[in-house]
Amino acid sequence: IAVPAFGPSLLFGLGEGAVLPIIPLMARDLGASVPMAALVVALISIGSLLNNIPASLITMRWGERGAIVAAGLWSGLGLALCVLTSHLALFATGCLMVGMSQAVYNLARQIYMTEAVPIAYRARALSTLGGVMRIGMFIGPFLGAAAIHAFGLQAAFGVGIAGVLGAAAIGARVPDLETPPTPPGQTPPAATTIVSTLRDHRHVFLTLGLGVVLVSAVRASRQVVIPLWADHLALAPAVASLVYGLAGGIDMLVFYPAGKVMDHKGRRWVAVPSMLIMGMAMLWMPFTSGFNTLLLASLSIGFGNGIGSGMIMTLGADHSPRHGRAHFLGVWRLMSDIGSSCGPVLLSFLAGSLSLAAGIAATGLIAFAAAGALAYWIPKTHGSERS
């Protein structure tokens, strides 16, 4: 069961992790300036952001298995375009395609696990799903580095293509979920649309959904905060990388216990502490003055983020209706991606206009606001599966 359920996520994360550190270097080799190379990298996030709603339509049309296979093939095609072209515009197009495939894959996997796993095990399943993908993203750069050492810079894309195509191959063997028949005497529910989903579930989107936006902003900012503050402290790049890697290691160790707590105690018991821990660590970071204190703050951020693995997916699954689930989760993931895009932008703005310390502290305050929103809006029951 574990291989078809989590194998595609491990391979998909591994494939993307292998190429992400190389994309800006390849863009520079193709003549991009430093700002242009950063924009090319950002196209992956932009592609995911823009494709969340179309991803829901693709999943409803082709089913979860078809969407997983299509996402792997589309990502492989995008990576192949990146490695075969000598034109920056086509390279950027390939990166956009990778981001688009992310949206389809992540949505299809979330829907599949939501419907296939009993609600009593939902948080553990979705936390493991998120954790396994993080493990793949962690392993990918090492495999990419080994390939580069042996065969050159472009070899990392070979690892990436193998990973996403392997995910598609395993995904093709995942059994389709059967749609429950309409009980005798009942009229089949009317077809849902994005507009009807926004209308019918606007209260959830405008309350808990805004909390999810804040959570995503904090999570995305953490990836920038640690290396920037390490540079501010004049630590060597290798030391900064070590701190970042250790924080990522803590992140990966705690996802399953956190999911078990969510299943047994309720979502609040993990969601709120996750944001409080990250908020306190963010507020502490500007007061760190060297390797030891920076490492402790970074490990705290990693722990807080790790216990929240799968939290956004679980909350979305809890509130999604059985009928029209793809539309609901497409909007849910769109809100999450909006937060992920805005968090680093706000940090950059505050760092430029005030100081880096002010930007990091503001991110910590956003984490506290997210904790308050989650504490207030998450239902007290363990789940809220809706018919």
Which residues are covered by each model-predicted region?
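Helix-loop boundary and gating motifs at the non-cytosolic
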Residues: I1-A42, T207, R219-W229, L233
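Structural signature of the two symmetry-related core transmembrane helices
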Residues: A67-A80, I161, W269-L283
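C-terminal membrane-cytosol helix-exit motif in multi-pass small-molecule transporters
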Residues: A162-P183, A370-I378
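Helix-to-loop junctions at the C-terminal end of transmembrane segments
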Residues: N51-G63, V254-G266
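Cytoplasmic helix-loop-helix junction between adjacent transmembrane helices
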Residues: L96-M133
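Core transmembrane helices of Major Facilitator Superfamily
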Residues: E16, M97-R109, S300-I312
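Juxtamembrane intracellular "pre-TM" segments in multi-pass secondary transporters
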Residues: D176-L208
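Helix-breaking motifs and short loop linkers at transmembrane-helix boundaries and internal kinks
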Residues: G63, L84-A89, G266, T288-S289
